[in-house]
Amino acid sequence: MSRRKQAKPRSLKDPNCKLEDTSEDGESPDCKKRQEEGDELEEEEAVHSCDSCLQVFESLSDITEHKISQCQLTDGADIEDDPTCSWPASSPSSKDQASPIHGEGFDFGEEEGIPGLPYPCQFCDKSFSRLSYLKHHEQSHSDKLPFKCTYCSRLFKHKRSRDRHIKLHTGDKKYHCSECDASFSRSDHLKIHLKTHTSNKPYKCAICRRGFLSSSSLHGHMQVHERNKDCSQSGSRMEEWKMKDTQKCSQCEEGFDFPEDLQKHIAECHPECSPNDDRGALQCMYCHELFMEETSLLNHMEQIHNSEKKNSCNICSENFHSVEELYSHMDSHQHPESCNPSNSPSLVTVGYTSVSSTTPDSNLSVDSSTMVEVAPPLAKGRGRKRAVQQTGDAPTSKQARVSYSCIYCSKQLFSSLAVLQIHLKTMHLDKPEQAHICQYCLEVLPSLFNLNEHLKQVHETQDPALIVSTMSAMVYQCNFCSEIFNDLNMLQDHIRSSHGFPNPVTKDSNAFFCPHCYMGFLTDTSLEEHIRQVHCELGNSRFGSPVLGTPKEPVVEVYSCSYCTNSPIFNSVLKLNKHIKENHKNIPLALNYIHNGKKSRALSPLSPITLEQSSLKMMQSLGGTPSRLAGEYICNQCGAKYTSLDGFQTHLKTHLDTVLPKLTCPQCNKEFPNQESLLKHVTIHFMITSTYYICESCDKQFTSVDDLQKHLLDMHTFGFFRCTLCQEVFDSKVSIQLHLAVKHSNEKKVYRCTSCNWDFRTETDLQLHVKHNHLENQGKMHKCIFCGESFGTEVELQCHITTHSKKYNCKFCSKAFHAIILLEKHLREKHCVFEDKTQNCGTNGASEQIQKEEVELQTLLTNNQESHNSHDGSEEDIDTSEPMYGCDICGAAYTMESLLQNHQLRDHNIRPGESAIVKKKAELIKGNYKCNVCSRTFFSEGGLREHMQTHLGPVKHYMCPICGERFPSLLTLTEHKVTHSKSLDTGNCRICKLPLQCEEDFLEHCQMHPDLRNSLTGFRCVVCMQTVTSTLELKIHGTFHMQKTGTASVVQSAGRVQNLQKLYKCASCLKEFRSKQDLVKLDINGLPYGLCASCVNLSKSASPNANVTLSTNRQVISQTDSLTCVEAKNYKTSVLKTRCSSCNVKFESETELQNHIQTIHRELTSENSATQLKTPQVSPMARISPQSDEKKTYQCIKCQMVFYNEWDIQVHVANHMIDEGLNHECKLCSQTFDSPAKLQCHLIEHSFEGMGGTFKCPVCFTVFVQANKLQQHIFSAHGQEDKIYDCAQCPQKFFFQTELQNHTMSQHSS
């Protein structure tokens, strides 16, 4: 079976693995390491590929079925012997069955398991004859193989091997073939599969000539031939060879299956280690045994294989005496036009040459052919005698022995053509068949046998020695002038340079020819090397050829075609005409010469001259006296005579102009003077220019810049991960995870409450939680909203609430604080006051103790009334006091602790009870730069420098977001922002249109319409709809708007002081009294309280139902004795009529309320109507007409259309989704979203990239830490008129520039 890697056979244990230094499992460390490497290689052998076609399969059942159906593996013994079929197929359905791969239930036979067999077990002393038996047995050692496959129950020693094996079951095939649709789970499987798409099969069978891609496939194929043989001699020899250690190369340790592969590897890769460099190896055609000499090969074939084969032809069953005669006879079957094949060719001692033609149109286009060397008689003769037919009277002693050389391994010499043929068919079977040319008559012959027959019959009477001697006496005359050359190369160079040969020599043309064998070469250097190596001539015979001294020396008559680029040579005009008819049919001028019967020598620039003319020319070239006159320049085409050489050459050029072919463009038939201009012109027809963007790293081409940028980001960029705790940088996600686990993962205990599942870091926090929530609440149902403390009665709770009053007021902004430290901090940060000003900001009241107690009691009672004054029975009580709970992380202030806890849980992921952890986090995030004046810390030096300016003087660093003017303090900026209000002349609420009479009504009304999106205060101005950042700003808005309505703030303050002096409230029922004597003074926990008589009596008679009685009593008293006017009661009644009973939403009219109930709560209305009247349901489509005065409050994000109610906007958005789908693409980064709101939030993030994670409103400059918070703020606080960026092509407007860019690219891009 084909393997990706050739693993070391496990039959040989490492002798270095000793038992002295053993580890835990009894193996030495080195031995254990080598065994693990071997196990990895063994797991890699799980590739299932066919030996014949190299097709890869995922399971062994598939490859078995493939071999039976497609590769004709029908013999049962073949399947059994095949190592790929020794492992059962695994599938996910077999995991519930008993595993067939365990060794307990497998019958190996009696001879298996005994010591001494080739494959020993690494866990016990047993050994086996086959590797498949060993694998089955190893599965029984479950204690040594801890990792198990969940699909087929196969055991593995390593986890990575098990995971790699599981991919074969799960079908995770991420490696795809580029040639076909095949996919594989491993890359090595894909590499093996890719070999099936290659047409090159270098490994060929010597018996049936079938090609294979790998040596292992050839080895498996050879086993089929061995089983078909009747004799087992070669099979036993192959088994003996497999048992030897000579399968490995001694130089590079590469393994081979056959000796011929090893010998071929040594000859090609390690020629210095070859046993004989001068003579190559000869291989027997029957048993593939190698021999260094011809005598040894012939003797081996006569002695070993003569009795078996008897040299009989497989086609006609004719027997021959020698192997040489058999090979010659077999060639005759392939070429029936040759001589009688039954005549055995006699070995004549003549040489032969072969000249190749590289003309594209020529039928004789071959690369090279057999070469011949004229050598002296060999010193070592053959071991047997051969019958040679001697014809003629020439004695054999005068005939020279000719040696033959192979064109593929030029160092080998052969004494006969038959031996050379044996060598070619055994050692160079993959080489193409060559055409052979006779050196005497230049006849082209298809095979060595035909050449041998031709030499024997045609040139048998010629003396080889004489022929060899005449080869050097050939001279050539130029057909266009009288120049004579003794070398063919010199003549061709002369024609190209002197007579303007039109077609330049191409790259593949043979420009230089050997004077001995006429073999062509591309360069002069390669020709000289060929002459030196093949013909054993040290000098340059190309330029040193002997010249004839007498005019009686022969002249070779050759003809060359001028239409071919390399001028092929022919020995007769008939062959030249035949060549022109076959290869140059499209040239009418050449056909005219043929049809007219001319022996056109104009077509042959290599035409010969007479012997006398050649002798005269040679004598002139040697410096002798000229023996011919000047008038002897005769044109061989027309017979014209010229007395000068210049005139003769000019005349010949006229013949060339009529004969030479014209260079025309095949596309437009335009004529050109030379080949270079023709090539440039034709290139224009086939040339097209295109622009590509090439990656500088991997040279990949892309058609657009975006594709190139995406490729660079995906393949050639590195993403780094920075730890925000220690600022260390890592190159991968795994590295930073490991860093966080090692450096910043401190183990801490978490205490969890089992009742509410809250986690606490310390046991003290948990105890405090249990105390306030699970221990005291059993009997105390009244809980303080500020500190969370519980009380048994409502009187105790009301008395406790008075302790949360603020005693220290700021004289600049009227803020109040619980402690003097908070007041001093407020003065430093907000008003830049660093002196001790608290003596002027004392407590409320005079210095006398009596007045102080009276004022304190009145203040406490007033605060209780304000904190418990409700607007509706369904609404919660809202505290109007200043923010007293601040976040230690971001500085946000809230009026109630519950709001602070919600803020910490939502924004900082801090649960209630983690106060200590919050302080630690606040300490961790403190900066390293500390102010020396106020001890405030900063993260950067620039922040500290900017803060120091506040101590040096009033710097105007507060900018108005509307007009851009700067102010020195936040107070002055707040007062300035009020002047930009759009509702200066009215004091009505813009939400419910209720008129506001005083500043208290304004503050109370703002609490009725809270702004939940405002994370700082939770409120907004209900008159001008501006977002307020603090309670001070809200008060300034109330003062400003109430002044415009004619109510002076001075009169209001005087009225409040007068009311405080006259009215006294009960701490329980909040009933007001004119005199202090109407209240009973009580001392609870060291503090004085005032209660009315009825409340004192109710508190004395407190019972389990006391709470209900008190609340009922208080409602009755508040309804009868309250100081609220009748107009307020009527207003509340009207409000209740226009308020939804299900969701408590108020509407301006009853029509709007009914429409709201029918659209939003239509299920409840349908149920009520069905139970009462059982009438058909009212259609939910009833809506207010656009002609009404209702405000447009619903706007589509996509197209910015405004609608009047929620039902219309829902229908409109649904239509958008039906038409456009759920994919909304960002044109800036090509990211898609399923809703326009998410796309808008994403575009907001684009606008603030690189801003440090902060998002600022473009209208009011409010800063947010999340993009969705800014989006909610824009929807609630700003309208269509506040949008900044207008589209130039349509009326749509946008808040951010990125929205405009995305809109332009998606809607208006051409």
Swiss-Prot record:
SMART domains: ZnF_C2H2 (SM00355). Transmembrane segments: none annotated. It is found in: Nucleus. The keyword Zinc-finger applies. Residues 11-21 have a biased composition (Basic and acidic residues). Transcription factor that can both act as an activator or a repressor depending on the context. Involved in BMP signaling and in the regulation of the immature compartment of the hematopoietic system. Residues 1-10 have a biased composition (Basic residues). GO terms for cellular component: nucleus. This is Zinc finger protein 521. A zinc finger (C2H2-type) spans 48-68, 119-141, 147-169, 175-197, 203-225, 247-270, 282-305, 311-333, 404-428, 436-459, 476-499, 512-535, 559-584, 633-655, 663-685, 693-716, 721-744, 751-774, 782-804, 808-831, 885-907, 929-951, 958-980, 1019-1041, 1064-1082, 1138-1161, 1194-1216, 1224-1246, 1255-1278, 1285-1308. The lineage of its organism: Eukaryota, Metazoa, Chordata, Craniata, Vertebrata. Gene3D superfamilies: Classic Zinc Finger (3.30.160.60). InterPro entries: Znf_C2H2_sf, Znf_C2H2_type. It holds the Pfam family zf-C2H2_6. One of its GO terms (molecular function) is DNA-binding transcription activator activity, RNA polymerase II-specific. Residues 87-97 have a biased composition (Polar residues). The keyword Zinc applies.
